[in-house]
Amino acid sequence: MAITTTSRKAAAEQFLQLACTDVERAYAQLVAPGFRHHNVYFKGSASALKEGMAENLRQFPQKKLDVKRSLEEGDYVVVMSHVRLEPNTPGYGLMHMFRFEGDRIAELWDVAQEIPANSPNENGPF
C-alpha cells in the first residue's frame, strides 16, 4: 500500500527526530534499499551518512531538533528545522529534501546555516 502525502511528511519528520536519538532505528524503519544522499561531507552511501549521524549523536547527546515547516510535492518532502547541538545555543537552521520511493526515503539532500548569536535580522531565521 502506498504511503499517503500526510504520512510522507510525517515519515520525513520522524526520520529527523529519530536521527537525534536512535540513528539505527531511523534507518531501519524509514530508509529504502539503495538509499543515496548528497551531503558533501560524507561518501554517498547510506552507511557513510549513517555512521556520520551516529558520530554526531555521540558527540552531542543532548541535541534537539524542532521542525518549523514541511512541504510536499509528489515524491518529495522538504523539511525546515532548527537543531541545537547543545542546550542554550543558537544552533543551526536546516533544510532537508527527501525523495521517497513508496513509503521509504530513497534520496536525501541537506543544507545547514549556523545561526549567529547576534543576528542583525529582526525577523529571525524562521
Question: What are the roles of these predicted feature ranges?
Answer:
Residues 1-126:
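C-terminal and inter-domain tail/linker signature
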